[in-house]
Amino acid sequence: MVALSTLSGLSALPFLFSLVQNVYGVSLEVSTEKGNSSSPILYGFMFEDINHSGDGGIYGQLLRNNGLQGSKPGLTAWAAVGDATIAVDAQNPLTEAIPHSLKLDVKQGASGAVGFTNEGYWGVPVDGSEFLNTFWIKGNFSGDITVRLVGNNTGTEYGSTKISQSSNSSNFTKVLAKIPTKKAPDGAVLYELTVDGASVGGSSLNFGLFELFPQTYKSRSNGLKPQVAQPLADMKGSFLRFPGGNNLEGASEARRWKWNETIGPVENRPGRQGDWSYYNTDGLGLDEYFYWCEDMGLTPVLGVWAGFALESGGNTPITGDALKPYIDDVLNELEYVLGDASTKYGSLRASYGRKEPWKLTMVEIGNEDMLGGGCESYVERFTAFYDAIHAAYPDLTIIASTDQSSCLPSKLPEGAWVDYHNYNTADNLVKQFSQFDNKDRSVPYFIGEYSCQQDNAWPFMQGSVAEAVYMIGIERNSDVVKMAAYAPLLQLVNSTQWTPNLIAFTQNPSTVIETTSYYVQQMFSVNRGDTIHNVTSDSAFGPVYWVASSADDKYYVKLANYGADTQEITVTISGKTGGKLTVLADSDPKAFNSDTQTLVTPSESDVKATNGKFTFTLPAWSVGVLAAH
């Protein structure tokens, strides 16, 4: 279906041209004989904290620079209110992990409200749920603390609470408050904390580690932001690869993602300098990733650090005996995840509230070790990690971070997988349609990252159709391609390090941008069979591509029209009488959805078959899914 909003922006000539497009036809007959089994976990997610996809994104905590973490945090996002000043204070650390606090100095003779604001991650999304606010206070104080969520430009109050509190100058006291809210029309909202200036004039107070959460996805403590989590849940993916990606590797050994610094109370998590320009709080840590998987029914794919930092940073790659402490660290991590409560690290997990071990079946060793000087040493490093992990956990599927044979042992251990990444232009993705047709079936593939990349800020129609063509090729070979994930996954529009991305968002609580590629991924993931069927056709592949599958008594035929002409499609499936047709299309191959426009969305229609024959139109530049019953 061509979106009307797209047509309204076209000149008369292209519009008339679209009315006289050539119409071609393709006839397909789907065999009811079962073919290859299709991977049950084919479609899923790759996540790392890039584009503020974690902090400021799917992680529910809404205040930026909330713990003043890092060696020189500064006052980013903070501002003083009233007759007071604020400063970063290293003399009054909250904990060893949170070495700074926010010092509020109130002027002698102050009056009225004094305190500070936090602007969040380019705004605070107030969605109308009950918010939970925690912070720590130190200093001689007894009185009321007022917390408000207030329009930055309008002064409109979207939530407030008053807390009667006392504290002393010897220790930090934790404060917890619930804030009823009403939904804000945009993200231009500030968090504001004030006290009565007259009662504290000429004195100072210290505040530490602020947290502000809306009602989280599945009501998890320290959980996910529903605004961002729900579109992912709607995709019905099957796996989550975490924590990266480049953000696993770090710029050096010291700056790698350290699992043991992402667990337990958040006041004991120091965070780290992330690999995409900003500091990571690590509030979204190891356990939170597993809760995410549990709440969305996702198979976890845990990436572990493998002795190599980005571009051979620091003293990496690490080889030989020097690698042993890092192998031991991974074994400790796996005991934390999989060990029962009687083990050292399993008991630590239990002490943090999770008695039962997590469900983990897949571990990936490193990330893109074919790049940046990692290839030559990866044979040794992969083998060392593989041998240790496999000896301790023989049932785990272990994935190499590359498929390049020059970086891998001459013979991979039986059961090991390889990870292949493919960022490419639209035309090249289409050319790779048959890439896996003749692959060795003894080595399973994980396509850990792929998308159309050609200097496009947003996924666009031609690129998304090309991705669909590539995905059809993957699904036809889903006996050997076990998993595939579009990347990157998420993007805060205000702070972007990589484009395009699958889902974008702002801090307007109503704004989530579901891109053309998002809809393709959703259409393919939701309509999934467990068996691939042979299809006979009167046409060769191109510009129309197809794959057929089934689950129980339902058949799915996925199609892509990578061209400017309309295609009349006939699909015959013996015994089927009806179904649902979902089509994503736009006659403009450059059409895209963004934070300022939504031009392309799928259309759904009921279709009937005559003697098992379905007939329908596949417009120019389109992706279609027929779910037949």
Swiss-Prot record:
GO CC annotations on file: extracellular region
Major localization class: secreted
Broad enzyme group: hydrolase
Pfam family, one: Alpha-L-AF_C
Metabolic or biological pathway, per its Swiss-Prot or TrEMBL entry: Glycan metabolism; L-arabinan degradation
Subcellular location: Secreted
Signal peptide: 1-25
GO molecular function per UniProt: alpha-L-arabinofuranosidase activity
SMART domains: Alpha-L-AF_C (SM00813)
Physiological role: Alpha-L-arabinofuranosidase involved in the degradation of arabinoxylan, a major component of plant hemicellulose. Acts only on small linear 1,5-alpha-linked L-arabinofuranosyl oligosaccharides.
Listed name of the protein: Probable alpha-L-arabinofuranosidase A
UniProt organism field: Aspergillus flavus (strain ATCC 200026 / FGSC A1120 / IAM 13836 / NRRL 3357 / JCM 12722 / SRRC 167)
Gene: abfA
